[in-house]
Amino acid sequence: MAKRVAITYEDFKKVAPYADALRLVGVDPVLISADEPWSLRGVDGLMITGGRDLDARSYGQERHPKSQEPNPARDRMEIGLLGEALDRDLPVLGICRGLQLFNVYHGGTLIQHIESGKHTVRTADASQPVHQVIIAPNTLLAAILGPGAHPVNSRHHQGVAQLGGHLAVSAKSADDGMVEGLERADKLFAVAVQWHPEDQVKSDPLQKRLFEAFAQAIPAHVTA
């Protein structure tokens, strides 16, 4: 039976790179949006994707003037799915907004607008790295990608402020120390990154390893 991973999304036009990355490593994507009934029944893992800013009220703040209009229904869906996945110890991979939700779920807060603009650099080719991250040794992310400096393509205007409980920081921006990777050591595979490996998976074998490791974590959980 094929491995199946739920992918959360809001804009169908933007979900293709995430789905393609999973197919590349032999996993069938199952798309889930807040517009339809959602659950993790019949799937073996969860990927939380990028998208618009989280509702600041979900971490006890008022919305910043430069924050995007939130989608509370998506926030509720992803928080519910993440809770279910962690309770069942299903493999979880968070990407960009997925890292931020991972932190908020665990009681953390966010920087609502990074004034420096260093993390919002965009290029015509989304796979092109824009800065480096430093991956911490003795973390699952280091076991997958290797410790030390790695070029990545992160692009975001929000980031982790207060770290949530049970979380370990696995990567930081080499420029300013912004959190770029989180994980839970007490779970089989609960990893989140701030950059967009789905855009690099075909051009950078190192980033493909992240999806391969995610897929390899699934067999113990394959749903009948």
Predicted segments with their positions:
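The feature captures the ABC ATPase H-loop/switch
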Residues: 99
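Conserved G/P- and acidic residue-centered "switch" motifs that form tight phosphate/ATP-binding loops
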Residues: 96
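Active-site-proximal beta-strand elements of phosphoester/diester hydrolases
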Residues: 190-195
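N-terminal beta1-alpha1 cap of cysteine-dependent amidohydrolase-like domains
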Residues: 1-93, 103-105, 111, 115-144, ...
